[in-house]
Amino acid sequence: MHTAFSLTFLGLALGLASAEAISVTPHEQFSSSVGVLGCLINTNRVAYFPSSPSCDKPCVRLTDKEHGREVTVLHIDSSAGAHDISYDAWNYLKTGKSAKEDPQQGNGIDVEMEQITLDDSECKALLTGSNGKIPVMAKSPQWGMECPKDAVEFYNIGTSTCTTGTKEKCEVSGDKVDCPSGDAGASGQLEGMSVKNIEYGTGKEVDAQ
């Protein structure tokens, strides 16, 4: 009986140790310092945290125990110090509703943070247009090249907001990335794949810059 109790207590302690208490704040403008493409992910579920993005555990599960709400976000950009998340994700934690439906304003929300792997179904669900892999710009491949091959896909798209380029997959060849259209493929205007931001306080969708 004593051993069983000890093991149970140890399991609870390890579970608590894996979660970190933070305060999350709203972030309106989509961006990615590691070249992840907004048109191929759910940009309403992105994390902008002080730590560097990890391709081993790219997603973060945030739990607001006070209100019983939980949201999973994709960590693909760094911040100067704040734990920012997409405005829509923050609004959901605050109200249980999308920012498009019930836009709110405010400050930090206290949550518990747990990093999760790409194999997690909620993490994969955020990669809406890239077969469950992290979509990265071929012209800025440095971060993606450090990831396991089965974790990323490279595309010949010239900006993280998908304003230029060609929606074609590129292949890793040695220490570089080769695209069917070559480097020039990333420079032309890309139609129909614009990234939207949800405007803070109004809930209106606007084109990301």
Task: Go through the PLM ranges and name each one.
Residues 2-58, 71, 78-82, 87-209:
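Mature exported/compartmentalized surface modules and terminal targeting/interaction regions
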